[in-house]
Amino acid sequence: MAAYFTNRLYFVRHGETDWNVAGRLQGQRDVPLNGRGRDQASAVGRLLRDMLAANVAELDFVASPLQRTRETMGLLRVAMGLPADPFAMDDRLKEIAFGRWEGRTWRDIRKSEPATAQARDADRWGYVPPEGESYAMLAERVKPWLSSLEGDTLVVSHGGVARVFLTLLGGMAPGDAPTAPIEQGRVLVFEAGAARWV
């Protein structure tokens, strides 16, 4: 897919939540930003404003519909000198679904379900958590969205989506993507088959 992607994509992971701090798997649960997360969203908006300057008006803005991404998008847009909305939302940009594991920590899962935790560790890209989805399934969900992009786009989404983008657009091997660190308060730029953090 990277060979066919000619636009520039600015990826922002949502700001911090209390579940991030606690190490809980959020998945598709609707968890709000905490104070630090709101500060991160505003800071990344200022970074984008300075980085993009006159090109801001040419961007398409799209977010996952979950609360933490909508909040992040609104705050960063205000920091960029834009109204908090409107911006588009797309269900395909929701976080990877962890199913029955949502709300739990990896430590708890490893303790209570060691066999399933080991199965996931053996194939992090292809493993499907109970009632959830794999990274491979998430990749199939976001491919049509990527193919639909017509111009440079700023997207606010989730760590799992960023890992899939690293594989589809940034040349990362699927086996490496599930453990790639995806930071909050920074911008991941995809362009010409490569990815770089700003």
Q: What kind of region is each of these model predictions?
A:
Residues 9, 59, 151-160:
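Generic beta-sheet signal
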Residues 172-198:
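Domain-level recognition of soluble alpha/beta enzyme cores
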Residues 10, 62, 88-90:
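General small-molecule cofactor/ligand-binding pocket signal
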Residues 75, 164-168:
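Active-site signature of alpha/beta-hydrolase-fold catalytic machinery across serine-
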Residues 4-7, 16-82, 133:
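Active-site-proximal alpha-helix that buttresses catalytic centers in soluble enzyme cores
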Residues 17, 161-162:
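Short active-site segment of divalent metal-dependent hydrolases/proteases
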Residues 22, 78-141, 179, 191, ...:
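Phosphate-handling substructures
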Residues 143-151, 190:
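Alpha-helix C-terminal capping segments
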